[in-house]
């Protein structure tokens, strides 16, 4: 993520901690209890304020009857990136809605990468765009997520 893009998202935390350190602490705390993402073999490659990049390899048990990756698995990858992106400020945040567009199939062995970017964060509402690409950089899914922050509930104790 570019420095300019990152600066647009950063806010000064009340505790004075570095925003990137907060995002890393949240990632570690969330991922250790995220059985779904871990069971699907997801790897969290990078997190930052309002940002996350997560990858997974499409396995045979993720294929549908057409021998392509079931859309639910790709959506789950995008949703996990969304979760790590919108919770990166250490304020417990949940999805209030998503819209998913399937652009291309993914196949067994494909390496999919979901990248989440914050579009807007105002009050307790956020909007995030997530793009899933394959190992060739081809867009497979785009998703827009709306989030709702739960007042006064940190993700991890810092």
Predicted regions and their residues:
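Terminal targeting signals and extreme-terminal segments of soluble enzymes
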Residues: 1-158
């Amino acid at each position: 993520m570019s420095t300019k893009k990152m600066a647009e998202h950063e806010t000064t935390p009340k505790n004075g901690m570095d925003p990137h350190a907060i995002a890393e602490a949240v990632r570690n705390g969330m991922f250790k209890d995220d059985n779904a993402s871990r069971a699907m073999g997801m790897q969290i490659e990078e997190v930052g304020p309002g940002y996350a990049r997560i990858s997974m390899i499409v396995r045979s048990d993720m294929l549908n009857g057409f021998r392509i990756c079931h859309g639910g698995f790709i959506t789950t990858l995008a949703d996990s990136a969304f979760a790590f992106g919108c919770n990166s400020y250490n304020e417990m945040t949940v999805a209030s809605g998503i819209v998913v567009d399937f652009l291309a199939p993914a196949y067994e062995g494909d390496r999919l990468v979901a990248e989440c970017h914050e579009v807007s964060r105002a009050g307790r509402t956020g909007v995030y765009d997530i793009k899933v690409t394959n190992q060739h950089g081809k867009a497979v899914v785009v998703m827009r997520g709306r989030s709702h922050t739960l007042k006064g509930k940190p993700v991890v104790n810092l």
